[in-house]
Amino acid sequence: LEYETKFNNRKNYPDIFAQFKYVIENMKNPLNGLYYHAIDVSREAFWCDKVTGLSQQCWLRASGWFAMALLDTLDKIDNSDHKYDAECKMLEDAFVDLINSMLKYQDESGMWYQVVNYGGMKNNYLETSGSSIMAYSLLKGVRLGYLPESYREYAEKAIDDQIDKLNELKDKYSEIINLIGTSWDDYNKKLKYSAEIADMTFTEME
């Protein structure tokens, strides 16, 4: 969209908005306001529902990326002539709704789980990068005026908890926890990444 704004006279704005509209209308779970991770319009992928084409999971990072995309698009769009008022309203409503839905699943620690709506599931875990994405979306949403100032505390809580989880191990190691597989289907093995000053070592934990 930024390219379209600066160099292409907004010619492909309609296509950009159409893609957002498709996701909003087809990938949102109406029961909890979360978005499914993926959709296969052919209904042929092994992971998809054969009726809807949707995956089964609401994945934290995917939800965060979508929140960022909505917000960053709103930030960069040129709507000075009000030609795209309806589209901007669509994106704003989707962003605010997604944030409010995600806040229902924020853990008391301040972070979110990898599979957002299964916080109590065995081997699900509080995920660092996705929680950072959500903190970014919350803070930028507040700064741009799409979210109330009170939402800042949710972002700060997520950031504070991640800082607390960066632990110094003795005097040689730094441990970054909660860096394991990108899918909850791969939880049979977990990786603990121990970063030594001289080099990186990987210790596999059963």
Walk through the language-model features, giving the residues of each:
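CBM-like carbohydrate-recognition segments
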Residues: 123-126, 130, 135-136, 140-206
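Short, solvent-exposed positions on alpha-helices
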Residues: 10-14, 85-89, 93, 149, ...
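Long, well-ordered core segments of solenoidal/helical folds
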Residues: 14-36, 41-46, 92-110, 154-172
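Well-ordered alpha-helical scaffold segments within catalytic/enzyme domains
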Residues: 1-9, 65-87, 132-147, 206
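Surface-exposed helix-capping loop/turn segments at secondary-structure junctions
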Residues: 29-33, 76-85, 106-112, 144-149, ...
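Extracellular glycan-targeting catalytic surfaces
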Residues: 13, 17-20, 64, 71, ...
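Solvent-exposed loop and edge beta-strand segments that line ligand/cofactor-binding
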Residues: 47-68, 85-87, 91, 106, ...
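Active-site cleft segment of glycoside hydrolase catalytic domains centered on the general acid/base Glu
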Residues: 4-11, 20, 49-53
